[in-house]
Amino acid sequence: PSPGVFTVDAWARGHIKQELLKVGWPAEDHAGYTPGTPHEIELAEDGWTLRPYQRKAVDIFSEGGSGVVVLPCGAGKTLVGAAAMAETKTTTLILVTNTVSARQWRDELLKRTSLTPEEIGEYSGQAKEVKPVTIATYQILTAKRKGEYAHLALLDALDWGLIVYDEVHLLPAPVFK
């Protein structure tokens, strides 16, 4: 490596960036992300288009490969997520607060993208479908069985190219550090 450039193991990236930030040294991470399993997804802009601020959010995400979208209720965060899915064209895990949200995401994806019902799975207390686009609840992922996060381990083992955290401020921090 060049002077002033450090190489770290992939598993340590997040921890190192957190520690550097704590001491006032934000890290510039150029490692990027793994692309995940390819899966064709297109926006079905039939009679609608993304609003300029939604398009801007998707463009910024595409340039950096990650991001947090903060918009008021009703401003179309789900559409931004769908557009990010269409940009990445990869398998996607969407984490939501409850089954009502899961079904709202499913309905919007079916209405606003080229995805079919066969491509979208629900992974919750009521259903255990793992598909190229899987919508799971935080609750099922944090459920322990014999001291283990069995559902989290199952979904973590898959090659997701994109993970969408809906209502990220409600995310159970001890599990998703």
Briefly describe each language-model feature range:
Residues 99-126:
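Conserved helix-turn-beta segment of the N-terminal RecA-like "Helicase ATP-binding" lobe
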Residues 139-141, 148-177:
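SF2 helicase catalytic motif II
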Residues 35-70:
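Conserved pre-motif I regulatory segment
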Residues 63-88:
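Walker A/P-loop
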Residues 69, 94, 134-136, 163:
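Hydrophobic positions in the central parallel beta-sheet of the AAA+
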Residues 124-134:
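Conserved motor-coupling elements within RecA-like helicase/translocase cores
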Residues 1-37:
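Interdomain "pre-motor" coupling segment immediately N-terminal to P-loop NTPase/helicase cores
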Residues 91-98:
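Conserved RecA-like ASCE P-loop NTPase motor core of nucleic-acid helicases/translocases
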